[in-house]
Amino acid sequence: QAGEVTGGQRAAATPPRRPALPIGDVDGERASSRSTGVGELDRVLGGGIVPGAVILLAGEPGVGKSTLLLDVAAKAARTAASSGRGPVLYVTGEESAAQVRGRAERIGALEPNLLIADETELGIVLGHVEASAPSLLIVDSVQTISSAQVEGGAGGVAQVRAVAASLIRVA
């Protein structure tokens, strides 16, 4: 039966704008992807990062997510510079810019087209995005960013949802 109970009221069914199609009839045009420079990650992502995509990388603490992201950021920055695209912006809410630079030195990831910002306020992060027009934005980690317009602390469900939604909109 159409509709579901939400807040004690039944939602009304709305006529679809276009009919549902058999999957084989859907245009198979594949969005172009950009290599991350890390072969195994490209394989997992189906060829690389699709422009406008939002990817959430999750894992246990200490498994190397931040190091992997920094490596990807440096390789993407190098590629972006050579192809005339904007810089890569790496926003860290977990470490200072100096700590990220230290790791970048250790893994050979110092690239002039790689910008680092250590911020935890969403408005400031969005200001960095607007000012730098990055070809790739990496946020490490979304749960450390908070919005002044949303109640609760960074990492809470409402904050993570609002921050993620804002970042998706700028993607």
Regions found by a protein language model. Give the residues of each.
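Detector for small/aliphatic-rich hydrophobic stretches
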Residues: 1-55, 67, 74-79, 83-90
